[in-house]
Amino acid sequence: MRLSRFLLPTLKETPSEAEIVSHRLMLRAGMIRQHASGIYNWLPLGLRVLRKIEQVVREEQDATGAQEILMPTIQSADLWRESGRYDDYGKEMLRIVDRHERDMLYGPTHEEVATDVFRKNVKSYRALPQNLYQIQWKFRDEVRPRFGVMRGREFLMKDNYSFDLTYEGARHSYNKMFVAYLRTFARLGLKAIPMAADTGPIGGKLSHEFIILADTGESAVFCHRDLLDKPAPENVDYDSDLQPLVDSWTSLYAATDEMHRPDHGVPEGDLVSARGIEVGHIFHFGTKYSAPMGATVTAPDGSSQAVFMGSYGIGVSRLVAGIIEASHDDNGIIWPDGVAPFDIGVINLKVGDAATDGVCADLYGRLRAAGKDVLFDDTDDRAGAKFATMDLIGLPWQVIAGPKGVAKGMVELKERATGERHELSIDSALAKLLG
């Protein structure tokens, strides 16, 4: 993509309404613009990041055997009355009456709809287990939306719902999501710590939040220091017994403020007390929804049995902000490789110079042909402005070409994360970027 044709409305000054780093940088980098309180337009740069996060989430869900579906954002209130949750959300739920005087709502979550999908389409235990997921927009009418997309009213979420015949099967489904979440967040360049958590209005007796540590986090969190360096699992066999792997994480103390115990037993020097941002939440809630809503299957003995369920959420749009909170410096965003809106920025320092134009066009073409996402700064801005823009938007690599270097057959390669710059031959720079 040529920058001269790309909608990138960057800002030099920090907007007064932005309270935290991620909100400031998302506005300054031209990723989002507010439409209404807690509701945002996603501009091209922001949407590219959102889509890349979606893809990582999707790949890790698919690896577990979960199946993607898409459920409506507007839901029937009757389903929520069936489950008994219609009044639990209070004013946080946006309620709608259609032209036929039917009560509807903009879904804050999808347990009821997912249960309805299941009960209408699965009748026998032979079709179990099932795990259905979607990536869909949701709405919760927060009293005080703040912090940009970190705590907006409209947000993009990956949510899935598991259905099993037995408690043991449901625990295995829960463990699969536990492990998949560890892998997902690691691929996004985040250290997310699973913490025992309150189940809230979702319900159930087993729940973990996945928390990234950040000074701007809204929640107080506590964990054993060893969790900070514990690597995410690789080469997972999701059909195997995952309980030992899950136990290796949950045996180390970690809890949100609501679940924190004074008798935690962690030596004082090993207990980390910090602020955290929730980026994922998983629940096992048995038959809380299936029993009242009649989501049953015919069991092996011929009886009708309510299925055991779990639900699992990742805040996809919130993750964009979370990654920025965890990875930035004074100059702007530092995107991890897997989610950067572009892999490489090519900077032409002298637009109109035939030799420099030719080298930049060649670099741009060869990098794109190799499958790289490239943003080519072909504008006639001054060099300082070009560097500031590239640092602000945080692409992992910058290739800088100017007349002096080009005359020697050289370009400059800059790594955003470290700030290191090296002068290399054009072929060496390409080899480094494509290696």
UniProtKB/Swiss-Prot annotation:
Any one GO molecular function term: proline-tRNA ligase activity
PROSITE patterns xref list: AA_TRNA_LIGASE_II (PS50862)
UniProt KW keywords: Aminoacyl-tRNA synthetase, ATP-binding, Cytoplasm, Ligase, Nucleotide-binding, Protein biosynthesis
Annotated TM spans: none
Catalytic activity: tRNA(Pro) + L-proline + ATP = L-prolyl-tRNA(Pro) + AMP + diphosphate
GO cellular component: cytosol
BP-aspect Gene Ontology terms: prolyl-tRNA aminoacylation
Principal subcellular localization: cytoplasm
EC numbers: 6.1.1.15
Enzyme kind, highest EC tier: ligase
Localization in the cell: Cytoplasm
Keyword Ligase in record: yes
SUPFAM superfamilies: Class II aaRS ABD-related, Class II aaRS and biotin synthetases
Subunit structure as annotated in this protein's UniProt entry: Homodimer.
Family: Belongs to the class-II aminoacyl-tRNA synthetase family. ProS type 2 subfamily.
Function per UniProt: Catalyzes the attachment of proline to tRNA(Pro) in a two-step reaction: proline is first activated by ATP to form Pro-AMP and then transferred to the acceptor end of tRNA(Pro).
Name this protein carries in UniProt: Proline--tRNA ligase
Source organism (scientific name): Rhodospirillum rubrum (strain ATCC 11170 / ATH 1.1.1 / DSM 467 / LMG 4362 / NCIMB 8255 / S1)
